[in-house]
Design a protein with these regions (language model features):
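Short, low-complexity disordered leader/linker segments with a strong preference
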Residues: 1-31, 329-331
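Short, glycine-/small- and polar/acidic-enriched structural segments
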Residues: 25-165, 172, 179-185, 200-202, ...
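Short polybasic/polar patches that bind polyanions
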Residues: 56, 150, 193, 261, ...
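Short amphipathic alpha-helical segments at helix boundaries and their inter-helical linkers
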Residues: 82-84, 175-177, 277-294, 327-331
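Pocket-lining segment of extracytoplasmic ligand-binding domains
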Residues: 89-90, 162, 168-261
């Protein structure tokens, strides 16, 4: 009788264990340190992906870290403090030189300008001669300044150039220490607003569209990609989801609110920057790849660097653009 009871108890316990749900193993998200610049163009995908849960769906937790420009972002990646970064057009020359790889297009921008003061006697590009002009080295705005000088048959020797960081450009321009400066959004619109209209855009990316395409991209170091190519593909997949949301004009106000929160600025300021680029969807990016236009755009960008003397010789765009990653992430 005791043996029978023991058998019955064993069977009962087995049945109970069979129906008790086993708690799912908790998988900790991969924490990524992601570099950005404080503007809409740099943040529209990152903040959308965070707030819509696209990155968490891919197993990531993003820690956003602010930088002033692309070259300093790449330097931070090289010292190991940043995993993934966003860069504007100017820093692409560092990718061409082998310091990083582009794993996804972000957008084609129009955020750079040479800003000038009317009080300094500037109304056209030739008026830059003899003027104090500020710029941030290695940025896309420096390229716009270079093109402006070329169009006016001027050289760097014809102006009084001052190399500064982004925040110094803004304050120096407003104080009158500079007569003109090469900068980018949101500083461009802020200079107009805070100067009471004295400061204006002398020229922008659009004025030089025949020579340069203002490509803005997501980048990673070669070594990081070799170790974590699957991680980068998943990250790109989340970017694509963010594109499909953020590229819809009806969602601009929501994205602008998220950008404003991250930058601690007014929503209206972020919303005013939605004209700084053409915001692509996932299909837009794929169409550019499949048609060969994206490769040609990056080549055009590279040729503009060669023409300006920023790089010495042309290299295949496939050396630094990870087209396969962009394609695979869309599957």
């Amino acid at each position: 009788m005791k043996k029978l009871l023991a058998v019955l108890l064993t069977l009962l316990m087995t049945c109970l264990l069979a129906v008790i749900p086993v708690a799912a193993e908790t998988v900790e998200p991969v924490v990524l340190n992601v570099a950005y610049m404080p503007n809409y163009a740099s943040l529209w995908l990152a903040v959308t992906g965070i707030h819509q849960g696209y990155f968490s769906q891919q197993g990531f937790e993003l820690r956003l870290v602010e930088f002033a420009d692309g070259p300093t972002i790449i330097a931070a990646m090289e010292n190991g403090s940043i995993d993934i970064g966003f860069i504007g057009p100017g820093a692409h020359k560092l990718c061409i030189n082998g310091r990083a790889k582009v794993f996804c297009l972000s957008q084609i921008g129009n955020a750079d300008a040479v800003m000038a003061s009317r009080k300094a006697g500037i109304s056209a590009i030739p008026d830059l001669k003899g003027k104090k002009v500020g710029y941030a080295s290695g940025t896309s705005s420096e390229m716009i300044l270079q093109y402006a000088l070329e169009d006016a048959a001027l050289t760097w020797e014809d102006i009084i150039p001052y190399e500064m960081d982004a925040s110094s450009l803004f304050t120096a321009m407003l104080s009158g220490a500079l007569d003109a400066c090469a900068c980018w959004s949101p500083a461009t619109s802020a200079l107009v607003e805070h100067s009471g209209g004295d400061i204006f855009a002398l020229c922008t990316n659009i004025d030089f569209a025949d020579r340069s395409v203002a490509l803005e991209s997501w980048i990673v170091l070669s070594g990081y990609y070799e170790r974590h190519n699957e991680r980068i593909e998943k990250f790109t997949r989340a970017l694509y989801q963010a594109m499909d949301f953020g590229s819809q004009e009806k969602n601009f106000p929501q994205v602008a609110q998220w950008v404003a929160e991250q930058c601690a600025t007014e929503v209206e300021v972020a919303l005013s920057q939605t004209g700084d680029a053409d915001w692509p969807s996932r299909q837009d990016v794929l169409d550019l790849i499949e048609s060969g236009r994206l490769a040609e755009y990056y080549r055009t960008q590279q040729l503009s660097f060669i023409a300006s003397g920023a790089i010495e010789h042309e290299v295949p765009v496939t050396d630094y653009i990870l087209f396969d990653n962009m394609i695979n992430a869309a599957r």
